[in-house]
Amino acid sequence: MSAALSDFLKQSNLLQVTDGGPLVAGTDGVEGTRVDLVGEVEHAIIQVQETELLAEVCNTVFDVMKQNGEVLVFSTDLTTAHRKLRIAGFRVTELAADWPARGVKSVNFGDKVTLDLGNATVEEDLIDEDGLLQEEDYEKPTGDQLKAGGCGPDDPNKKKRACKNCNCGLAEQEEAEKMGKIAEASAAKSSCGNCALGDAFRCATCPYLGQPPFKPGETVKLSSVDDF
């Protein structure tokens, strides 16, 4: 054991953590100290071989160690020991071959910064919703505006028909109009007596125009037929 390492082991307030295994030669006579307060440890040695336990011990030692405190880890796998020290927060320094893994607690805290939030108040961020509306937004829509736009291109000379996969509402509108006409025709009374005979015998104002012949008193029902 080098003189420098021997001097380290003679430090006062030395924290020693072992897993109960055989101690490294030269450390068996070291008396460990009991930690009562966080941040009071200046020097520590760790002799733990199990990887998961070593990680937990390194984290604990980091928490109780003073700023610029120094810890030595005696391990058969220095690469793993260095990694566990770094993960715990220690700054690892490479030493001579006869030295164990060495870590120094070096944590820098930045200065406090005061945030300038200004004098803005919550009321200044609120927007009057009514102020976003225009005059035309208050106008009540007409019946034509509420009707479905229809399928296909606009053609003033042709009546719009709902397409097969209509999703604009025109198909429902046509169905409602059709059912209204059927209900109106069912409630109508014949004035000429020829309504049940068919279009060839019906007058120009007959409510049954376009419907098939039927028996007098029979309710006229049209089957839903797809034109496409």
From Swiss-Prot:
Region (Fe-S binding site B) location: 192-206
Chain segments carrying region Fe-S binding site A: 151-168
Subcellular location: Cytoplasm; Mitochondrion intermembrane space
Main location, first listed in the record: cytoplasm
Residues reported in the UniProt entry to bind [2Fe-2S] cluster: C151, C163, C166, C168
Repressor as UniProt keyword: no
Organism superkingdom: Eukaryota
GO molecular function, one term: electron transfer activity
UniProt short sequence motif Cx2C motif 1, positions renumbered to this chain: 192-195
Region (N-terminal SAM-like domain): 1-109
One of the record's GO cellular component terms: cytoplasm
Cofactor: [2Fe-2S] cluster; [4Fe-4S] cluster
Keyword Iron on entry: yes
InterPro entries assigned to the protein according to its UniProt record, in alphabetical order: Anamorsin, CIAPIN1
Keyword annotations of the record: 2Fe-2S, 4Fe-4S, Cytoplasm, Iron, Iron-sulfur, Metal-binding, Mitochondrion
Sequence segments annotated as region (Disordered): 138-159
Residue numbers binding [4Fe-4S] cluster: C192, C195, C203, C206
Pfam family, one: CIAPIN1
Positions occupied by motif Cx2C motif 2: 203-206
Role noted for this protein: Component of the cytosolic iron-sulfur (Fe-S) protein assembly (CIA) machinery. Required for the maturation of extramitochondrial Fe-S proteins. Part of an electron transfer chain functioning in an early step of cytosolic Fe-S biogenesis, facilitating the de novo assembly of a [4Fe-4S] cluster on the cytosolic Fe-S scaffold complex. Electrons are transferred from NADPH via a FAD- and FMN-containing diflavin oxidoreductase.
Family: Belongs to the anamorsin family.
Notes concerning its domains: The C-terminal domain binds 2 Fe-S clusters but is otherwise mostly in an intrinsically disordered conformation.
Protein name per its UniProtKB record: Anamorsin homolog
